[in-house]
């Protein structure tokens, strides 16, 4: 495998940048409709080829760079440096693993795992969505299918993809799967591998989508719970006292105008609310497992606005007031910008300090990290071994991986505003922000307003 010099690599990227800049400056008024479509097709080819060019870089990083050099996992490093989502970073890493060249333990080069697919991408004949369909096919294909058949199937799908849209390729891949593996994957191991539930991002109206695949055991469990709690008349939020333990009478059933989907939702809420109130979940990161919400005294008194949970979600004040009647949740109030001056001489933060950090930081304070407070630990900005105090004004939240970065060259400090600054080691410092504003979008917007001329 040929190795290029730093100068050759830099020169090639400079030429690529210059060529693209020339294309960006083109004025296409003189082109006819067929010519415009032809130009778009040529640009699409180059867009696809660029993805292939990234594979070698990503695979080399995966093979040679440790987390200390990267400042975290490869997924996190790519997301932060390239300003892409962690999900997109994972997709690129997985694509590079499947389509990029590999090396054996002895150092000799090996072809890509999906050889035909990699070649088609390199020629610009297939794009990201085609590759996604082919990867999904092999993710579902049983390991019992021998190597020769797998290679032939991959070559056929890659060839089919070069002349079809991804959505058309999907139907062909489904038919091929039926021929190669007609009985499907019904083993316990396959079901365990596929299980999962995903809660989507919170939308503008506060609602969140949920999706996933349930094992037969979980489905059977949910069926039993819903048979009771999602029955007509049960757990009806419109009732003054919703029925949970008792069986709804005819009048309760008649009053219930909810759909089955709405009754399912309310049943899950009642079941999880009861579990939280039971106290049987023990503790999580120094606090009883419960809902922690932060808001301002002004918003609470006005019964308007939104609180922010330890998980990073937004809760309307009307919901927050109603939630307070069901369980012993924690509510952290701010009458001003700074939390209470809580401190003590023990190394571990007290429950009260944790609550205030949940409210103040809302999540990991390292720039670029989106871990919410529920998934973060208390970090001493000034090492405890130096001060022997655990002062609320010298504490912050950091997720586990970021907390450990302080042992690998990172430093933390408080600025004049009480915000935590993260200072990377020199080899990772590319001028990135020192403060994490991800959990405080309102501050970002206010800072932009302040920067604009008046």
Curated annotation (Swiss-Prot):
Gene Ontology MF terms: endonuclease activity; nucleic acid binding; zinc ion binding
Pfam families the UniProt entry points to: DUF222, HNH
Matching SMART domains: HNHc
InterPro entries xref list: DUF222, HNH, HNH_nuc
HNH domain ranges (all copies): 364-405
Family: Belongs to the Rv1128c/1148c/1588c/1702c/1945/3466 family.
Name of the protein described by the UniProt record: Uncharacterized protein MT1183
Organism field: Mycobacterium tuberculosis (strain CDC 1551 / Oshkosh)
């Amino acid at each position: 495998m040929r190795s290029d010099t730093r100068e050759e690599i830099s020169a090639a990227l400079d030429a690529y940048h210059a060529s693209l800049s020339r294309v960006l400056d083109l004025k296409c008024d003189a082109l006819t409709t067929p010519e415009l479509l032809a130009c778009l097709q040529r640009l699409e080819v180059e867009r696809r080829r660029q993805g292939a060019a990234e594979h070698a870089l990503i695979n080399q990083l995966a093979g040679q760079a440790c987390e200390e050099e990267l400042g975290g996992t490869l997924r996190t490093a790519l997301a932060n440096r390239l300003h892409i989502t962690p999900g997109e970073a994972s997709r690129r890493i997985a694509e590079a693993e499947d389509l990029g060249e590999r090396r054996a333990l002895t150092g000799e080069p090996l072809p890509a795992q999906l050889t035909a697919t990699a070649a088609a991408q390199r020629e610009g004949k297939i794009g990201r969505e085609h590759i996604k369909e082919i990867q999904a096919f092999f993710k579902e294909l049983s390991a019992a299918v021998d190597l020769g058949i797998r290679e032939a199937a991959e070559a056929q799908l890659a060839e089919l993809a070069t002349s079809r849209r991804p959505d058309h390729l999907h139907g062909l891949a489904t038919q091929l799967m039926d021929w190669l593996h007609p009985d499907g994957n019904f083993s316990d191991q396959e079901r365990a591998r596929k299980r999962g539930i995903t809660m989507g991002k919170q939308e503008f109206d506060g609602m969140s989508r949920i999706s996933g695949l349930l094992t037969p055991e979980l489905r059977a469990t949910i069926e039993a719970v819903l048979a009771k709690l999602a029955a007509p008349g049960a757990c009806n939020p419109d009732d003054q006292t919703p029925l949970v333990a008792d069986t709804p009478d005819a009048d309760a059933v008649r009053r219930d105008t909810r759909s089955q989907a709405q009754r399912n939702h309310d049943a899950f809420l009642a079941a999880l609310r009861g579990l939280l109130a039971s106290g049987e979940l023990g503790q999580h990161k120094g606090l009883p497992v419960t809902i922690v919400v932060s808001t301002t005294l002004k918003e609470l008194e006005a019964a308007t606005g939104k609180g922010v949970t330890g998980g990073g979600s937004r809760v309307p004040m009307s919901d927050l007031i109603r939630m307070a009647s069901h369980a012993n949740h924690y509510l952290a109030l701010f009458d001003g910008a700074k939390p209470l001056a809580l401190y003590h001489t023990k190394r571990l933060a007290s429950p009260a300090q944790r609550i205030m950090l949940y409210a103040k930081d809302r999540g990991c304070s390292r720039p670029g990290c989106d871990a919410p407070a529920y998934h973060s630990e208390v970090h001493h900005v000034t090492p405890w071994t130096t001060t022997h105090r655990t002062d609320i004004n010298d504490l912050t939240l950091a997720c586990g991986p970021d907390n450990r970065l302080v042992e690998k060259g990172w430093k933390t400090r408080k600025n004049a505003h009480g915000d935590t600054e993260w200072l990377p080691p020199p080899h990772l410092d590319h001028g990135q922000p020192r403060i994490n504003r991800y959990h405080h979008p309102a501050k970002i917007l206010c800072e932009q307003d302040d920067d604009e001329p008046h």
